[in-house]
Amino acid sequence: AAGLISDAEMANILQQAEINTGGHSKIASVIPQWFNLPHQINATLPSILGDDTAHVLARAVQFFLPGEPQVYYVGLFNGKDDQDFFAKTKQGRDVNRHHYSPAEIDEAIASPVTQAILGLARLRTHAAFDGTFNWKQLTDSTMELQWTGKDSKLKLWFDLSGSTPAFSIKITDGTSSRSLTSLSELATI
């Protein structure tokens, strides 16, 4: 994170992750001898965020930013830290390497979070993503990410001020548009 955020901001993120994971992320994360902070947080994003809407919003931001979004299978399945696997191997990264049974995969794929993330993946093929990207920070807690194509536009608006974040994805094709504001609506894409 060097250069992207300050050490103080990173320490705050690590502290919040520790709180949200009941202290487990601190145990699983390794602090290199040459630095005072871990180089990565060994915990799953769903465990760190502790909220399904926050997790899907983080994925929406990821999908709206330029580049090729990548989602690890545990994140797609909304997987929480596998503390049992970590306890067995003592390898910090193993908290994010759950071995899913076929029944667990079926359950995860049917979940609202996974269906919403799959909807975002389908949306990423929209023609507007071949256009121009821009973003605006509206307030300390609200932002818009937007793609504008020849005949289409996609806009992600979100607000982080509440205990649960709010978001809206507006899809405009020609003269028609629709807005999606929930996980279940994202699943319909």
What are the language-model segments listed below?
Residues 1-189:
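Active-site and adjacent substrate-binding regions of carbohydrate-active enzymes
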